[in-house]
């Protein structure tokens, strides 16, 4: 059984959402934030990413310099550059193996962190294992779409890292780091 206590590497969550916790429409991102994409790359480079198949499909290609682990219900699904798994536990095992194999090859780049990369089902399954969330909050008027799970705000220490006003068609957004106040160990 997978518990936080027996995790080999810490699991982080990275997400962009609006004030209604909307993360997408089930197919695409709802906004384009070039600065956030650079930030995402910097934070996740050298780490395994765990994502659902719909998230993989919306990206359309593997993200270089990272393991692209895709959790899918299909036992026959394959895609170039993806590591297909059928359970969250298998995703963690593959992520740990990738870290172990890559840390010796390129220890300057490989991070001992696993990132939950979306979508909503991946966050729902994996959030209990996370003690850190890298969050982008986007000012974007939408009340319908795929939602990030509701957090118990009192369980998290929130630090605002940066705020960006709307400019040149890019919506207002801010970067936050959430750290769980009491880390759950089972």
Q: Each predicted region: which residue ranges?
A:
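Enzymes that bind and transform nitrogen-containing heteroaromatic metabolites
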Residues: 2-186
């Amino acid at each position: 059984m997978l518990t936080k206590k027996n995790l080999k590497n810490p699991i982080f969550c990275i997400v962009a959402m609006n004030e209604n916790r909307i993360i997408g429409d089930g197919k695409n991102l709802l906004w384009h934030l070039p600065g956030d994409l650079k930030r995402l790359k910097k934070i996740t480079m050298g780490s395994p990413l765990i994502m659902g198949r719909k998230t993989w499909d919306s990206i359309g290609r593997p993200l270089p310099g990272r393991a692209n682990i895709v959790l899918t219900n299909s036992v026959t699904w394959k895609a170039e550059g993806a590591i297909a798994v059928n359970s969250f536990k298998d995703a963690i095992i593959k992520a740990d193996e990738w870290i172990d194999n890559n840390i010796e090859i390129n220890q300057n780049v490989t991070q001992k962190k696993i990132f939950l990369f979306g979508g909503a089902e991946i966050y729902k399954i994996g959030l209990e294992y996370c003690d850190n969330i890298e969050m982008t909050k986007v000012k974007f008027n939408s009340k319908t779409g795929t939602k990030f799970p509701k957090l118990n705000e009192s369980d998290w220490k929130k630090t605002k890292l940066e705020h960006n006003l709307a400019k040149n068609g890019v919506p207002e957004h801010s970067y936050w780091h959430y750290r769980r106040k009491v880390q759950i160990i089972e």
